[in-house]
Amino acid sequence: MSYQCPLCHQSLLLARQQWRCENNHQFDCAKEGYVNLMPVQHKKSKEPGDSPEMMQSRRAFLDSGHYQPLQQRVSELLEKFLPEKAESLLDIGCGEGYYTAVVEAQLNKRRNLKIYGLDVAKIAVRYGARRYPAVSFCVASSHRLPFADKSLAGVLRIYAPCKAEELARVVKPQGIVLTVTPGPRHLYQIKELIYQNIHLHPLKAEPLAGFELITDESLSYPMKLDGVQAYHLLQMTPFAWRATEDVKKELADRALFECETDFILRVYQRLN
């Protein structure tokens, strides 16, 4: 399996560190090993994706290990529900590859899967490609996936947006999509610092046309963070845009900040 040209949708072939289609559209491999499949005309800004500051905070927080239970559960669900003869898996919105790399390492203990990581942020993909060479990284839009119809056995989507039509297009029959979304009480204690009134609403499962929901579970646990970790956690979320400087300073000065996680994990299977 190879990439698909984002301009004409023909297959891309790799030769001399360059991906090229039969219409002679060319995409160079970066020295770090990733390929940029985001044409200028598809960009909505000069540097799409998260800011460098948000990515630095995310990297620092994730490296502290507080989201390892989610990392592990994602790997377990993929191992359980991926078809036995699966050959490829795509992580949409992979960022720097925190989840992608562990999925690759865990699944390939007994499989031989090609693992792809896709993100719109070039700086995140560059870092991931440098740190995790076993993963094939690309810069691309999650709304225009550079993969052929029915070419992927599975897709991992943690918080990332993606059109249901695109998922139905690229996932093989009997293939799966694993989504992770924040539950009602996710980071509730951070919300308390920012919002006067918090309303908890139960989340209904997202309908994905062409897929059947086969498992729906939550993962919740408490975290004990120091001030630096709490600050990085805030800065890696959209809550940072609403937080005042006083709130940020209060978090950073904490000796201990207790906060809860609440993740919703759902597995969908592609119908024939």
Predicted regions and their residues:
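Conserved SAM/SAH-binding beta-strand->alpha-helix loop
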Residues: 119-121
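Conserved Class I S-adenosyl-L-methionine
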Residues: 219-272
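Conserved beta-strand signature within the Rossmann-like core of class I S-adenosyl-L-methionine
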Residues: 174-184
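Class I SAM-dependent methyltransferase Rossmann-like catalytic core
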Residues: 44, 49-73, 77
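A short acidic, Gly/Pro-enriched loop at the edge of an enzyme's catalytic core
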Residues: 143-154
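Conserved SAM-binding loop of SAM-dependent methyltransferases across substrates and taxa
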Residues: 96-110
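N-terminal auxiliary segments of SAM/dcSAM-dependent transferases
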Residues: 1-47
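Conserved class I S-adenosyl-L-methionine
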Residues: 85-95
